[in-house]
Structure formats: C-alpha cells, structure tokens
C-alpha cells in the first residue's frame, strides 16, 4: 500500500485491513513515498516511515518498507513496483490506492507498464469517482466511510485541535514529541 502517510491515520489502516480480508492477502506492505514528485511539501521521509511502523505494529499482517525512502531522487510507483517484483518474484502483488489517486494514474511515469507489475485495488473515497479505466485492470472496493484525511490531521495539529481517535495513539505521541505540523510545514 503506497502513500505519503503524512501522517498515517485510521482510514489507512481500515483500508489495508479490508483489502487484506477481501483478497485473502498474507501481508500488506505499507510503502511510505520518499520524495513524491506530485507533492511539494511533505514531512521528512523517516518521520513518515516511523509513524507507519508505530501505527502498524499491532497487526501481524502489516509491515512497512523503506524501499522508497532509501531511493534517491523522486519516488515513482513504477520503480517501486519493479523493485518489489524483483524482491518477491513468486508473489502476487496488489497495489492498493484510493480512487482519487487512481483518477490521475495515466499521468504517472510509465503508466502503461503498471498494469503488468501488480493488480490494482482502488478503494472508494468520498467525492471521487473514476471513469474510463478498464475494469479488468482494477478491482474496486468500497470500504466503510471514514472522513479522515492526512491533510485534515495536519491542519488540526497546526490549529491546536486534537487528533486523538483520528490517528493511532502512538502516532499522536510521535507527532507531539517531534513537533510535526506545528508550522506551515514542519
């Protein structure tokens, strides 16, 4: 499951759990992006990685990969999937993404190659519909509605509002300890 995870929140965890259950996945690997080319301001990759580790620690089916944050330069999904395919040649790879991200998939680097590297699972998010993508390339899954977004969590911290129950407790503590999101970007 790729994402910025800035910060990771309960919505991400519910999606991962639902997809793992629906598709009988042995493991869900969370892959925090290193330097996403489409986002200018993101927290340090290692902060995002550690928050993902904290958030997923209690679920044995979840793990977190450093694959993207150890790569230099911009992070592209196609490069990540190629590297995972090399590391896990006999595994069926599923790429979990939101329908909002999927709406932009044809603008991604080497978009036509993505379909041969993994099966895509698009999870519905409120207000985002995807059209003009062949259904044989993607499985669509509706999960329980959770109106949580990372950008809203960051804004709440910046405004001095609580994020308890939006993100795992350990992540709340990590954000406070490291002073993340207190300024416009920090």
Curated annotation (Swiss-Prot):
EC number, UniProt record: 2.7.7.18
Entry keyword annotation includes Repeat: no
A GO molecular function held by the record: ATP binding
Reaction(s) this enzyme catalyzes, per UniProt: nicotinate beta-D-ribonucleotide + ATP + H(+) = deamido-NAD(+) + diphosphate
SUPFAM superfamilies to which the protein is assigned, alphabetical: Nucleotidylyl transferase (SSF52374)
Superkingdom of the source species: Bacteria
Stated name of the protein: Probable nicotinate-nucleotide adenylyltransferase
Organism of provenance: Tropheryma whipplei (strain Twist) (Whipple's bacillus)
């Amino acid at each position: 499951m790729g994402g910025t995870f800035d910060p990771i929140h309960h919505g991400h965890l519910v999606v991962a759990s639902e997809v793992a259950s629906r598709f009988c996945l042995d493991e869900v690997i969370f892959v925090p992006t290193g330097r996403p080319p489409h986002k200018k301001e993101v927290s340090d990759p290692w902060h995002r990685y550690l928050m993902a580790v904290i958030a997923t620690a209690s679920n044995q089916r979840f793990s977190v990969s450093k694959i993207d944050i150890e790569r230099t330069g911009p992070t592209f999904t196609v490069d990540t999937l190629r590297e995972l395919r090399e590391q896990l040649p006999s595994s069926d790879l599923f790429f979990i993404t939101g329908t909002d991200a999927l709406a932009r998939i044809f603008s991604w680097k080497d978009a036509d190659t993505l379909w041969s590297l993994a099966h895509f699972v698009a999870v519905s998010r409120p207000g985002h519909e995807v059209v003009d993508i062949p259904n044989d390339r993607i499985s669509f899954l509706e999960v329980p509605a959770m109106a949580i977004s990372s950008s809203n969590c960051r804004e709440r911290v910046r405004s001095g509002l609580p994020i308890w129950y939006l993100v795992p407790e350990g992540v709340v503590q990590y954000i406070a300890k490291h002073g993340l999101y207190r300024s416009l970007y920090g």
